[in-house]
A protein has these predicted regions:
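Conserved S/T- and glycine-rich ATP-binding loop of Class I adenylate-forming
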Residues: 30, 90-93, 129, 178, ...
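Short helix-loop-beta connector
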Residues: 123-127
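AMP-binding/adenylate-forming
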Residues: 104-117, 128-187
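Conserved helix-loop-beta element of the AMP-binding
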Residues: 128, 195-214
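Conserved AMP-binding/adenylate-forming
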Residues: 205, 214-310
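Nucleotide 5′-phosphate-binding alpha/beta core
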Residues: 1-89, 94-112, 116-120, 366-374, ...
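Adenylate-forming
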Residues: 185-203, 220-224
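AMP-binding/adenylate-forming catalytic core of the ANL superfamily
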Residues: 178, 289-403, 422
């Protein structure tokens, strides 16, 4: 099913025409309304009127996540606050959230893009969609919710947690589509078996999974265990949320980016130069229609490539291939962005621990876990066991409150964490080894 056949199947020439018109309008809007962009354009000697073709995109400045933090909370908003209808946010390395504002039209656009994505995955108005992404400041839950409602489907707004109850209600309510992280889908399967429910025996037929990296092997495992078709949705809160792109049920080779709203590029992550078509590099996205917080050439840090060959599904919008990595050190744990430096800043505030630590990432029962190993300083190592346990609990509580991620903290003896002559090894990711 194609949700918006006129927009999703328009000729490539028409897409480029729309993109240029909207890019020119975007440049005028941000130059007039966002001081940060006026300065950025002026520093490069560019005026909005200089943008005469899509080839001129390469002359425009990049926008970084740090720019959003530096302008916290509303410095990049391009409209008055009375036009902002919704605020979402994600965490950052400094503790300041990355804030995104949505106007009424932005939310309508989000619903449109998410509906296109669900339809591309194979969902219809006759489906019952269980949304098991988190709701709240995280964009996952409401994004899938908006899309399913716009599609005309029935929505079960489950959010995250209460895993066994989720499986029970999936059975009782007859859910046919599941929206969550891929790791949580496998966790639901295992939890169901513990209470005598095999999801394979339920009406569930389709999964729309995202918010964390996952492999083709994991997709096959999900399809085998749950007995469904597993599709890949992509999005990030800075750009909009889930629904920026989606793999289609027809081919499952890449995710269609809705190019009438998002203008993608692939650049060399080191030089910033635009790479030739088909090259692998960092994905950069310009938001063409966002009103609240429009972004020019936003560097996503996600590594992928673009595929412009025609798709048998009939959609003409470019496909991005599966994300293969990131150009920064951000970790994604159960859909939550976590930087090692965030945890480091918390540890350095705790009396009695040293600055030597490691994050051990593991995967058990298809869920990611983080163990924080941090060395005690010599003076504290002889403390009573009870005192050490209380200190571990305080650190765990601080990480949970600050980052929204549950961790296990283990205080270890001085000099037990290996030192390196070069860059310190802060992260040991055993998830990859365990998935082999």
């Amino acid at each position: 099913m194609i949700f918006n056949i006129d927009k999703e199947t328009m000729p490539r020439e028409k897409i480029r025409e729309i993109q240029l018109s909207r890019l020119q309008d975007l440049c005028r809007r941000v130059y007039a309304n966002v001081p940060f962009y006026r300065r950025s354009f002026d520093e490069k000697g560019i005026k909005p009127s200089d943008v005469q073709s899509l080839d001129d995109l390469k002359f425009l400045p990049f926008t970084l996540k740090q720019d959003m933090r530096n302008n916290y909370p509303y410095g990049l908003f391009a409209v008055p606050m009375e036009m902002i209808q919704r605020i979402h946010a994600s965490s950052g390395t400094t503790g300041k959230a990355t804030v995104v504002g949505y106007t009424k039209r932005d939310i309508e656009t989000w619903a449109e893009c998410a509906a296109r994505s669900l339809a591309a995955a194979g969902a219809t108005a006759n489906d019952i969609v269980q949304v098991s992404y988190g709701y709240g400041l995280f964009t996952g839950g409401l994004g899938a919710h908006y899309g399913a409602e716009r599609l005309g489907a029935t929505v079960i707004p489950m959010s995250g947690g209460s895993t066994k109850r989720q499986v029970q209600l999936m059975r009782d309510f007859g859910a046919t589509v599941l929206c969550c992280t891929p790791s949580y889908a496998l966790h639901l399967h295992d939890a169901g078996l513990e209470i005598g429910i095999n999801i394979k025996d339920l009406p569930l037929r389709l999964g729309v999974f995202g918010a964390e990296p996952w492999t083709e092997e994991m997709r096959r495992e999900i399809e085998d265990k749950l007995g469904i078709t597993a599709t890949n949705i992509y999005g990030l809160s800075e750009i909009m949320g889930p629904g920026v792109s989606q793999s289609c049920a027809k081919e499952q080779h890449g995710m269609h980016i809705w190019e009438d709203h998002f203008l993608p590029e692939i650049i060399d992550p080191v030089s910033g130069e635009i790479l030739p078509e088909g090259s692998t590099g960092e994905l950069v996205i310009t938001t063409l229609t966002k009103q609240g917080i429009p972004l020019v050439r936003y560097r996503t840090r996600d590594i992928t490539s673009l595929n412009y060959t025609p798709c048998s599904c009939g959609r003409t919008h470019v496909r991005m291939n599966r994300i293969t990595g990131r150009s920064d050190d951000m970790l994604i744990i159960r859909g939550v962005n976590v930087f090692p430096s965030q945890i480091e800043s918390l540890l350095l505030e705790v009396q009695g621990v040293s600055p030597h630590y490691q994050l051990i990432l593991t995967r058990e029962n298809n869920l990611d876990y983080v163990e924080v190993q941090v060395e005690l300083d010599g003076a504290m190592f002889s403390d009573a066991i009870k005192d050490l346990q209380q200190r571990e609990q305080r650190i765990q509580k601080g990480i949970k409150e600050f980052l929204g991620v549950t961790t296990k903290v283990r205080l270890v003896e001085p000099h037990s964490i290996p030192r390196s002559e070069g860059k310190a090894v802060r992260v040991i990711d055993r998830r990859v080894m365990q998935s082999r």
